[in-house]
Curated annotation (Swiss-Prot):
Source taxon at top rank: Viruses
Designated name of the protein: Uncharacterized protein L95
InterPro entries per the UniProt record, alphabetical: Ankyrin_rpt-contain_sf (IPR036770)
Amino acid sequence: MGGHVDVLDFLIMSGVGIEFTYAVTTASCYNKLSVIKYLHNQNYVINFTFALQEASCRGFVDIVEFLLTNCLDKIDTYHIKIILKSVILGRHNDIVKVYMDNGFYQE
């Protein structure tokens, strides 16, 4: 060991960030924008990538708009390309428009 700390192991063991990421993803699944806004305003360590994925694939426009506008620094931008492909294949045109309005373009 010698003082080496695996950051991911630490986060999983302590629950820091993981529980909030899970909470925001669950809120996204159930279209609970108020919960997402609350957690965002608490300045917790949260990865919003999976919340964006769930909201996008379920067609929740308000959540997608909020996440792309306010949480982009906490979203894996490479993953956005994958989400966008799924949204296009699922024919969620209203969600595709939100991505385009926020500067994401899929060729």
